[in-house]
């Protein structure tokens, strides 16, 4: 029943905005860097209702930070970082300060080989993070607090959505009998990678809050939007609200003189279980408006811990770029 409900909701382009509470913001002190870390609580709606969540503006703690260069679109070099060859291949990603990122497919002592293209530059500042996994984000022993179950039908379901293929990547749940994350075929799934721009869908068995921890995302964020009417589930990648009018989507989406002429941003209401607001970029007035042509205000935000739906009616995939809505000073 849960799976059928999920398909029905996604077929209606459903997405649920969640509230997030930052319960702590601490200063950790490794040998060479000071990292802001956070703990967030995100409510899950029970009774088989569906919620989309983000990773709460948190990432796996960086393992390296420094200057470098991008001599080709698929390589990044640094000056004598003394990396262990192969240490980051398939398990880590690199992120530039502007938000551009790529998974790492190989590395030598001073060069990273990249899975996807980065902009060529003689000088960049970058970080290396572990790719987030289900075990890493939610805990190998379910420290996040999902409702577990003996099988797929008895607990909360975590569903992965891939905008590039417009389909599910799989259904996961915490098996409380074997005490591990599993997929629909009961295979171990705790190592499943959760990419930074990947939508997360939760179908709640009971109403509760999950609790996640991580390093606070401080840099810009970049992701890809599907075209030709495709649905992209775009997270708020920060621990603060992001105003619709300041989110930077006008650089990636096509605006129009009316709502019907443009690409759309859709905000979900968890109480109504339906879309409550629809936005488009009005090219005549150069501003974001809702479907009733009211200008977007400071109160129209993507709340922390949530995601929104983007429907790009125009042709071709596009890259969206969002700046952090705050400044962190070490």
Show the residue positions of the predicted features.
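Bacterial N-terminal signal peptides that target proteins for export
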Residues: 2-15
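Boundary/junction segments of secreted and surface-exposed precursor proteins
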Residues: 27-65, 211-224, 319-330
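Surface-exposed interaction/gating patches
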Residues: 136-155, 160-165, 218-276
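Long, low-hydrophobicity ectodomains and other hydrophilic envelope-associated domains
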Residues: 52-63, 68-70, 153, 161, ...
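Extended, beta-strand-rich, solvent-exposed assembly scaffolds of outer structural proteins
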Residues: 75-117, 167-190, 274-299
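Charged, amphipathic alpha-helical scaffolding segments
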Residues: 172-216, 276-326
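Bacterial N-terminal signal peptides
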Residues: 14-24
């Amino acid at each position: 029943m849960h799976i059928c409900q999920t398909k029905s909701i996604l077929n209606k382009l459903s997405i649920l905005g969640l509230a997030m509470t930052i319960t702590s913001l601490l200063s950790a002190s490794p040998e060479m860097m000071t990292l802001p870390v956070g703990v967030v609580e995100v409510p899950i709606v029970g009774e088989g209702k569906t919620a989309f969540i983000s990773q709460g503006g948190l990432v796996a703690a960086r393992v390296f930070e420094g200057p470098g260069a991008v001599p080709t679109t698929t390589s990044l070099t640094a000056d004598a970082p003394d990396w262990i060859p192969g240490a980051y291949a398939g398990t880590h990603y690199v992120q530039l300060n502007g938000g551009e990122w790529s998974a790492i497919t190989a590395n030598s002592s001073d060069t990273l080989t990249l899975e996807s293209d980065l902009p060529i530059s003689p000088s960049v500042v970058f970080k290396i993070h572990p790719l987030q996994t289900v075990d890493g984000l939610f805990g190998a022993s379910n420290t996040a607090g999902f409702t577990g179950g003996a099988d797929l039908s008895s607990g909360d379901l975590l569903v992965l959505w891939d905008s590039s293929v417009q389909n599910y990547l799989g259904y996961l749940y915490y098996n409380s009998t074997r005490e591990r994350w599993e997929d629909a075929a009961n295979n171990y799934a705790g190592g499943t990678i959760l990419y930074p721009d990947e939508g997360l869908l939760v179908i709640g068995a009971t109403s509760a809050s999950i609790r996640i921890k991580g390093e606070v995302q401080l840099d810009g964020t970049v992701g890809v939007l599907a075209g030709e009417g495709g649905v992209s589930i775009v997270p708020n990648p920060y621990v603060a609200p992001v105003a619709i009018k300041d989110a930077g989507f006008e650089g990636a989406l096509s605006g129009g003189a009316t709502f019907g002429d443009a690409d759309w941003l859709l905000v979900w209401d968890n109480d109504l279980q339906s879309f409550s607001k629809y936005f488009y970029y009005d090219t005549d007035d150069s501003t974001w408006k809702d479907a009733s042509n009211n200008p977007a205000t400071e109160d129209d935000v993507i709340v922390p811990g949530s995601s929104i739906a983007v429907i790009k009616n125009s042709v071709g995939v596009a890259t969206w770029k969002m700046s952090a809505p705050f400044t962190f000073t070490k």
